[in-house]
Amino acid sequence: MLTERQLLILQVIIDDFIRSGQPVGSRTLSKKHEIALSSATIRNEMADLEELGYIEKTHVSSGRVPSEKGYRYYVDHLLSPQRLTKDDIQKIKSIFAERIYELEKVVQKSAQILSDLTNYTSIALGPAVKENKLKRIQIIPLNQQTAVAIIVTDTGHVENHVITVPASVNPSDLEKMVNIFNERLIGVPLVDLKDKIYKKVADVLRKHIRNYDSMLQTIVETLDIPQEEKMFFAGKTNMLNQPEFNDIQKIRPLMKMIEQEKDFYRLLRKHNRKGIQVTIGRENQLSEMENCSLITATYSIGDEQLGTIAILGPTRMEYSRVITILNRVASDLSIALTKWYQNG
C-alpha cells in the first residue's frame, strides 16, 4: 500500500514525464510547488517506489521514468478527467454535422478526428456486415446487357456490383423480380439472404417470371459480400513523431504491423467490452507493442454493440486527455447512430 506522499510523488513523476519525455530526478521534483519536501526525502521515497516496481532508472540519466506497473497504477487510481476545450468539442461535433447515410463513413471520419485531436494513431472497427440487415435491393440497367445491382443495409452500408443481364430476361421481368425481393427480404440479415432466397423467394419467382433462374443466380452471386468488419486507420505515421521512436529500428516492427493490419484486427476484436479499456505495454501480448498503449471504447445503436474505436500511442501517452476525448466520441457516436438509424 503506497503512502499519500508516495502517491503524490508517483503522480508528479508520471505527469512530468508524459509532458517532457525526460527522466525525472529528485531535484526537479523538489522545485514543484505541490511537493513541499527536501531533495533527500524525495530521493528516499523514489528509492522505495523503485524498489516496489513503480518507477525505474534509465541507462542515460540519473532520473527515473514510470514502469508499466507505475502507468497501470496511475491509470487505475490517480487519473482525473481532463476538460475538453471548446475547439475539441467543436471538432467532435463536426463528425455529426451532416445527416449520416453510410455508417462506415462516419466511423472513418471519427477515426480521423480522433487522430487529429490526439496526434496519435487511431483505429476504428466498423460493424460486421454479416450483422447488417437488408434495407433494399435496386437494379439499374446500364444498357441491354448490363446493369448495376445496389444492395443497401439497415446501417447504410452500400454494395454496388455491375452484373450481366441474360438476354432471356426483359426489363419488366427484372423490375418484377426486384419488387419481389424487396417485398420478401427486407429486414433479413445478409448472412441469411441466400438461404431465404432459395427457400422462400425462388418459388414465387418461378410462378411470375419466365427464365428467372439465370438472373437469380447472377443476383445471388452479388450477395457474396465480405463478412468481416472493415477497419479504418488515421494518423498511421504519427508514432514517428514520438521521441521514444526516433530509432527507426525500434519502430519498424510496429509500423509493419500497422501496415499489415491483421494483428490489429484480432486485437480490437478482443476489446469488445463496454466502457474504456486501457492496455499498457506488454499487456497487449505483442512484442511489437511493448512500448505502446492502446485505449479502446465501443459504440452502439441502442443496446446493440456495433464496433470499436481505439487510440494507439506510446506508453508515455496523455492518458487523461485521450480517455476523455475517446469517451466523448464513443458516446456521441452511439447517441447519433441510435437517433438516425433506430428512430429514423
From Swiss-Prot:
Presence of keyword Mitochondrion: no
Biological processes per GO annotation: negative regulation of DNA-templated transcription
Source species: Geobacillus stearothermophilus (Bacillus stearothermophilus)
NCBIfam families: hrcA
UniProt keyword terms in alphabetical order: Repressor, Stress response, Transcription, Transcription regulation
GO MF annotations, alphabetized: DNA binding
Protein name in UniProt: Heat-inducible transcription repressor HrcA
Transmembrane segments annotated in the record for this chain: none
Its biological purpose: Negative regulator of class I heat shock genes (grpE-dnaK-dnaJ and groELS operons). Prevents heat-shock induction of these operons.
Family note: Belongs to the HrcA family.
Presence of keyword Repressor: yes
Gene: hrcA
Entry-linked Pfam families: HrcA (PF01628)
InterPro entries, A to Z: GAF-like_dom_sf (IPR029016), HrcA (IPR002571), HrcA_C (IPR021153), WH-like_DNA-bd_sf (IPR036388), WH_DNA-bd_sf (IPR036390), WHTH_transcript_rep_HrcA_IDD (IPR023120)
